[in-house]
Structure formats: C-alpha cells, structure tokens
A protein has these predicted regions:
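Residue-level recognition of strand-loop junctions within catalytic nucleotide-signaling folds
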Residues: 16, 48, 92-94, 131-133
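Conserved glycine-rich beta-strand-loop-beta hairpin in the small C-terminal domain of fold type I
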Residues: 44, 59-69, 80-93, 124
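PLP-dependent enzyme catalytic core of the Aspartate aminotransferase-like
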Residues: 96-97, 105-114, 120-151
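A short linear hydrophobic-aromatic micro-motif
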Residues: 76-80, 112-117
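Generic structural signal for small/hydrophobic residues in well-ordered secondary structure
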Residues: 11, 43, 61, 68, ...
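Conserved core segment of the aminotransferase class I/II
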Residues: 2-62, 69-71
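Short, solvent-exposed loop/turn segments at secondary-structure junctions
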Residues: 1-2, 18-20, 85-87, 96, ...
C-alpha cells in the first residue's frame, strides 16, 4: 500500500535454507497462480524508485492529515484522536444515528463513502480514509459537515 499499489499481491522471502527455497519453488504456482508477469514488473519498478514514491505518498498523507485535523477542529459535533501514522481515522459524531444508517445516507445524499464504525463494533463513528487527492478530501469533508448541519 505504501507504494500506491494496493491491488498487487506480491511478496518476497529471504532465507539461506535451501530446503525452504526448494519447497517454496515447488509451491509457487499453486500459491501465486494469480500473480502475473505484470505484477512482478510493477513491483520491481516500484522498488527501484521506492524512495521517491515513499516521499510523494508521505507528503500527501501529512498534508491530508492536517486538512482532516483542521476540519475536525473547525466542525461542531465531531471529534477524533489524531492519527500518528496510517491512512485512516475514526471520526466520532454527536448524532443519534447508527453508523451504518449514517453511511447509507451519506452515500445516497452526498456521494460520500465512509466505513461505518459498527464494522469495528464501535458505534457513533465512521472510518475516513485520507490517502488521496487533497482537494477531493476537503470537498468530501465539507459535504460531511453540511450533512451534519442539515441533520
């Protein structure tokens, strides 16, 4: 995920044990039948430029975390624990509506897609991802604020 290639299913194993290497080699086609040459190529390309990709993505996350933090501070009826790392946050809201119902309404009425807190056995909150375009994040948060004011 850190390389913005969350759809790739890749992994490497490092060992000096030749028996382990032989066993892995025998099972590779069975275990990774859906991983193709393109996946290998993209993963290799990402690793060849890992510092540049990491810094780009880190900059996006830091900027967006600040956008989210300012929004939480400026928006009445919401609170959260500011994330130290990661790409998501649990934002708590002060409305008497189950998180699943809230999320269904948000997607229907505002086009917003959040994960209900009930998915994590935590009512009264939604999980918000912030690892994408900063302008889109700000627009989405504004729509969420509008919804909270309207309801």
């Amino acid at each position: 995920k850190i390389f913005s290639l969350a759809g790739l299913r890749m992994g490497w194993i490092a060992t000096r044990d030749m028996d382990v290497i032989h066993q892995i080699h025998e099972r590779r086609d069975y275990d990774t039948i859906s991983c193709g040459v393109l996946d290998d190529m993209l993963a290799g390309l990402a690793l060849a430029h890992k510092e540049k990709i990491f810094e780009r993505n880190r900059a996006i996350l830091l900027k967006n975390r600040e956008i989210l933090d300012k929004w939480v501070q400026d928006t009445e009826g919401v609170h959260y624990v500011k994330p130290v790392a990661g790409t998501t946050a649990l934002v708590y809201y002060d409305k008497d509506i189950p998180s699943y119902d809230l999320c269904v309404r948000l997607i229907r009425e505002k086009g917003l897609l959040f994960t209900p807190g009930s998915c994590f056995e935590m009512e009264g909150c939604v999980r918000i991802g912030y690892a994408f375009d900063s302008k889109l994040l700000a627009q989405g948060l504004e729509k969420f604020a509008e919804f909270l004011k309207e309801n």
